[in-house]
Amino acid sequence: MYIIALDIGSTNIKALVLSTEIKNKEENIKLIGKVRKKTTDFTNFFYEIKKDFNIESESIECIVVTGTGASFLEDSIDNIKIFKVDEFTAIGYGGIVLSKLNEAIITSIGTGTTIVHSNLNINERIGGTGLGGGTFVGLSNIILQNRLKNNDIMTFLELIEMAKNGNRLNVDLNIGDISKNSIGNMSKDITAANFAAVNKEFTECDLIAGVSNMVLENISLIVKAVNKNDLPVVYIGTMVTDDFVKERLKEIAEYTGSKICFIENADYAIAIGAWEYYLLRHREVI
């Protein structure tokens, strides 16, 4: 039998395909594949998975779904039950299970950002912001629109490469630019004003580095503000799988005094959280 878990976001669908079998009266669950596609069409995506993995509908135990797009789905497809998991629960479960922490602030940077306090028993959204990967890609493309032809859109990976080759200090004003000393408890490395260094020379790469910093620093500061008990912060989402992004988040954490951690499969953490919830909670009562 198979279980398919999907995180249906506003721009992408991510899926996990798991096989289940009973051996010596014990169930063995194995991850056999991960799939990601830029689409919001669940039905076509589901049939593509069936075809690619050679799975018959009769052999699928359940389809576990979460994410903003899950609310648009019916309760079944091809007579297969669709089990819906609240997105905040999936975020909490994914972050806690993968980090192996007992309690943490799970920060999901997707198109926007959601902040969830979780200890598995509690999965509560405590904050969020419209800033996220969508902001980085969208605003960067707006800034670069004069160089783009035929309505081309630069991808996240292309823009990250530009940011790596840029220097945000050529477009941003830091506390250290306007004060000899730190101000209060604010480090000299904290941005005083995004894109305010208009008297400096800068490149397009500097501009994109500035956009990435604006997004990441403000997300980090919002997380710090809502993290009242100074719990560890687990970052999840596709954006935080990039080394450049992780390094910048680490730098910001140093001057905010935050404890942060990164996990493997951070880009699939919400889908993982959904099927973990299904296996650990739902199956206990059926």
Where are these regions (language model features)?
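Active-site rim beta-loop-alpha module in soluble metabolic enzymes
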Residues: 141-224
